[in-house]
Amino acid sequence: MDDAPVEIPITDALDLHPFRAEEVRDVALEYLTVARERGFRQVRLIHGRGIGMQRANVQAMLRSLDFVQNFWDDASLGATVVLLSGKD
């Protein structure tokens, strides 16, 4: 198995489906950090609808980040919309 880093294009949305559950926190944190550095103020983390475990884990992480101003569900897309503060 190739453990080389995978570069993820930075757009206004990140689909978390391709990642293993144990990778999601690190991947989402890296994505949010880079998105903020590149000037994004609002992004979507797509975690799916399912039973809500991935959503709960993502939102728990978002509560711990000081550069996240707010977030809310977009249930129709199975996503959480995240409002980021501007760069320092």
Describe these PLM feature segments.
Residues 1-88:
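Long, charged, low-complexity intrinsically disordered regions
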